[in-house]
């Protein structure tokens, strides 16, 4: 059954009962929004302009920054619209589209996996690095990661169009999440309970296992290096990536746990966890790489001091 076009739009709620402080909350979100745009935008400009950053690792970082910007662009305008302008209504199609674009979380997981592969190649077979990760191969990997994310979530989103919706039109958050929308469906939603578990297991959690295995091999290689200074230099290459992996997967597991087992948790807990999941990684990723990657630090200095690019 196709969803009822005559049914009213969904209503975004969010921080119910705290309307008096919506302005303060929105200002905090606006600062985070600006920081995400500035941080990831600056990273993209650096990689675009600085020829010394035209290497596979930085191309993958550019993909990560693009993904973080996409997540933010599709979430924050809706959030700010609810908090500042009280624009709570959202059409079914717009809601489903927003849920679809949230598949960028799976894309981000794939990019973090690819960055682990990049680190693995750089440390295990450094002399063959440029032969293995050619520009065409980097492009194909990026397209593959993007297609995997979108295609894996497509069955869930298409199923949303097939359900009738009745009863309350209120959604828990200030943006559309599949876990939230499906609760309003008046039909058998067994598929929408089982498929996300399989999907997440075969993408995000499998990616995490492969990353762990790759770092076990990386550590074995590094421990075989005679010089302690060279060990530290090799590991420092991957510290920023490990930090981003931890940030992403901790927030994913937190959000999944809350939606699966936190039915009796206070209203504000799942809402806060969803914001942490969608905003914290895009906020900290450029900071982590700027602090831990010397090439990016030098590029930032050249950019803001007006020096010629490498």
From Swiss-Prot:
Origin organism lineage: Eukaryota, Metazoa, Chordata, Craniata, Vertebrata
UniProt protein name: Olfactory receptor 51B4
Keywords: Cell membrane, Disulfide bond, G-protein coupled receptor, Glycoprotein, Membrane, Olfaction, Receptor, Sensory transduction, Transducer, Transmembrane, Transmembrane helix
Gene: OR51B4
UniProt xrefs under SUPFAM superfamilies: Family A G protein-coupled receptor-like
Family membership noted in the UniProt record: Belongs to the G-protein coupled receptor 1 family.
Record organism: Homo sapiens (Human)
Cellular component annotations (GO), alphabetically ordered: membrane; plasma membrane
GO biological process, one term: sensory perception of smell
Function (record text): Odorant receptor.
């Amino acid at each position: 059954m196709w969803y009822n076009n005559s049914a009213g739009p969904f209503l975004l709620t969010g921080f119910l009962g705290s309307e008096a402080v919506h302005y303060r909350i929105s200002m905090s979100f606006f600062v985070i929004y600006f920081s995400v745009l500035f941080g990831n935008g600056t990273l993209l400009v650096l990689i675009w302009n600085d020829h010394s950053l035209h290497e596979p690792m930085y191309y993958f970082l550019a993909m990560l920054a693009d993904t973080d910007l996409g997540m933010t662009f599709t979430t924050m305008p809706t959030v700010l619209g609810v908090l500042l302008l009280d624009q709570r209504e959202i059409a079914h199609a717009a809601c489903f589209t927003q849920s679809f674009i949230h598949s960028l979380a799976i894309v981000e997981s794939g990019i973090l996996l690819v960055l682990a592969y990049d680190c693995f190649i750089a440390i295990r077979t450094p002399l063959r690095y440029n032969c293995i990760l050619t520009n065409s191969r980097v492009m194909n990997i990026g397209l593959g990661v993007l297609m995997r994310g979108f295609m894996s979530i497509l069955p869930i989103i298409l199923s949303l169009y097939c359900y009738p919706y009745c009863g309350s039109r209120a959604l828990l958050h200030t943006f559309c999440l599949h876990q939230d929308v499906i609760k309003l469906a008046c039909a058998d939603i067994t598929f929408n309970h089982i498929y996300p578990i399989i999907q997440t297991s075969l993408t995000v959690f499998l990616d995490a296992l492969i990353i762990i295995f790759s770092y076990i091999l990386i550590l074995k290689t590094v421990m075989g290096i005679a010089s302690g200074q060279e060990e530290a230099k090799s590991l420092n290459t991957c510290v920023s990536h490990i930090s981003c992996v931890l940030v992403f997967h901790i927030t994913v597991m937190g959000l999944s746990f809350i939606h699966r087992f936190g039915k009796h948790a206070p209203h504000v807990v799942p809402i806060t966890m969803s914001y942490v999941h969608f905003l914290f990684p895009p906020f900290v990723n450029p900071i982590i790489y700027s602090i831990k990657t010397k090439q990016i630090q030098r590029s930032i200095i050249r950019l803001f001091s007006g020096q010629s690019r490498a």
